[in-house]
């Protein structure tokens, strides 16, 4: 499917020079005083991992990869792979851990994720927007801290470090965004 250079967004997977590239940074739209407007895009090659900056005219059209999306349940780790089960057909799928990169600690047993396939090959895994995790380490609660809006460091059960409000204690469950690893609220 062809998309305008102005429509490119972070996370889009493009077919460029016969390779698959994921847009890794928010594209910069620039309109210089002289010449035509262009879009500066930082991309990462999904096969080799190399990064590249692409500059496209606002009038250019690029090929967006047509991905098939399946709901899968995470079962367990097997070596350097994740073993997932297609929730519709119950087929087991092995996916390399590298696909998740920094988001790997958010993966919990039986979590439902979306796996995006290109030509029947798993390309990306989309985690739920938020997860509920327990605080395993943080400073003690300070009395009267509900009034202030300051944050303190905390380590969650999966080892991720986040900033949490002063009134939270060890053992409490919180909601965390998976895209930028930030605190949202206390879990209900």
UniProtKB/Swiss-Prot annotation:
SUPFAM superfamilies, A to Z: Nucleic acid-binding proteins, Translation proteins SH3-like domain
Localisation per UniProt entry: Cytoplasm
SMART domains: EFP (SM01185), Elong-fact-P_C (SM00841)
GO molecular function: translation elongation factor activity
GO cellular component: cytoplasm
Pathway recorded for this protein: Protein biosynthesis; polypeptide chain elongation
InterPro entries named among the record's database cross-references: Elong-fact-P_C (IPR015365), NA-bd_OB-fold (IPR012340), Rib_uL2_dom2 (IPR014722), Transl_elong_fac_P/YeiP (IPR020599), Transl_elong_KOW-like (IPR013185), Transl_elong_P/YeiP_cen (IPR001059), Transl_elong_P/YeiP_CS (IPR013852), Transl_elongation_fac_P (IPR011768)
Keyword Repeat included in the entry's annotation: no
Keywords carried by this UniProt record: Cytoplasm, Elongation factor, Protein biosynthesis
Location (main, coarse): cytoplasm
Single GO biological process annotation from the record: peptide biosynthetic process
Family: Belongs to the elongation factor P family.
Task of the protein: Involved in peptide bond synthesis. Stimulates efficient translation and peptide-bond synthesis on native or reconstituted 70S ribosomes in vitro. Probably functions indirectly by altering the affinity of the ribosome for aminoacyl-tRNA, thus increasing their reactivity as acceptors for peptidyl transferase.
HAMAP family: EF_P
Listed name of the protein: Elongation factor P
